[in-house]
Structures are given as C-alpha cells and as structure tokens.
Amino acid sequence: MSQVISLLHDKGGCAKTTSCVNLGFALWLLGKKVLLVDTDPQCNMTDTVDKTVHLEAESTIYDWLHDFKPGEKRSLPIYTRYDGLDYVPGSHSMSNINAELQLMYNREHRLSDFLDTVDPESGAKIRNMYDYIFIDCAPGGETLMNTNALVASDYVIVPTEAGIYSLQGLPRLLDYIEKVRTQLRCPVSILGYLLVRWNAQKAISKEVKAYYSNEEEVKAPLFPVYVRECVRCTESVAYEMSLFEYSPDCTAADDYMRVAEYLIGRKARPKTWTPRKWGQIANAAFQHFIKEREG
C-alpha cells in the first residue's frame, strides 16, 4: 500500500506545488511508482506536468468528484507522464467544488473513495498501485476539498517558506488538522515541516528555522534538509519541467533529491548517484514525452 501525502499550508506562495512536483519526480528517479493529484483550482501542478491536458483530458479530478456514482463504469482520470509517474489533472472548475460538496452524501470522503476505486486494467485499488501519492492542496486552510485530502491521506507535509509570513496561520492549520483527526476519526498526521527558499545568510531564515525546530511548539519535526533559494524553481515551470529535467545540478534539485532519499530511508547517497546521472535519466524521459505528445 502506498503512502498518501498531502502538501498543505494555510497560505499561498509557499512552494506547495513546486515541492509536490519535484518530490514526485525525485522519488520516480529513485525507482518508486508515483501518482500526483491536483486539487487546486489554479491547476499549477497540472500545468507543470502537462499543459495540454486541459485541452485534451476526457476527465479530471473535478469530473470525478463532481458527479461520479459508485458502480458507474468510467475511465479513470489518470494520465501518464513517464512509466511509473502518473498524474490526476486538476480543473479550474474546482473553484466550485467546495459548494458542491456541501450537498453531497459522504462529502468528506469523496477523494478517499476515488483512491479506493478499482482500476479495471490491474484489478487493484488506485491507492495500492503506487508507492507514493502526493496531493497538491489549495491554499486557504479549512475547506471541504482540503478536508477530503486530509481524510484520504496518511500524512501531511507542510512546505514552509523561510520568511516571516510562514509563521502566520500555523495555529489555525494545526487546529484544523487535529479537528479532522478527531471528528472524522482519520489517522492523518504531520510528517514534517519542509523549509523552502532557505538562505543561510538571512537572519529571518535562521529565526524561522529556530521556531520550527521547536517540535513541542509546532507539534511535528522539521525535515533535516532545507530547500535553498533557487531561481531555477520558477524558470522550470515555464518549460513543463521538473528541476531534474531543467537544471539537474542546481541547489534545489539536490535538496529535493535529499528530501526524497530521506523519505525512503536512504542513509547515504551512492557515489554514482549524481546530478549528471539523474539529469541524463530525466532528460531522456522528457525528450520521449515531448516526441510522443507531438505525435
């Protein structure tokens, strides 16, 4: 069974999508089967993985959550970027989903029901087809869609910008997750805080690190790897690339790879596993993806 992990924060602009995409790609490069799920109406994850899917997709996560009925035969909204790296595209119509969920039976469990759906080809539940499933959540905290993500998840990763605004909203987020845990009786917990846009030269980065290092205060550990400030994070999105395809030797690519290695329990990186090596694998896969898409 996979680990289902939501990336969630009360505020926007804290690299949830960047972290979702690049952790997913890093784990794929490490040989894991990965599914990325986009529940944010901005669809930034979908646009990063494949911009054309909004024009060509027969089904998105919105279509499934909006009107799927148990027992109904319908193609799953799962698409393939690379062999072993799949994604469920989002939709701008997700801006309506919270109001629509209010009227639905079992409204907090729609996404969980989706992951429990049996794939007709493999005969396995979706959640059992992958090693890791990452859910890119919308900012805004306590919404029915985010509640769906928490109910469907085993863990939450909280990407946290190394700036003063990252401290705002944390008490609300912690209260929200605890309320979902207790009231809906789901076992979700915070896997850790992922410090992003880290700059060791800035005093505020050090202050934020010190705050999140107080596990008694923030109720979860801080990941031991910090994702450094890197302009390549913004640039790569424009080319529908992860960092590993766009700039495999940049600092952020190395940091996200180290976070992925931490997740799988790798204690030390083999000497042969270098930016050059993972860049070759990622670039070859990307060129094949573009060739296939262009027909």
Regions found by a protein language model. Give the residues of each.
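P-loop NTP-binding core
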Residues: 1-295
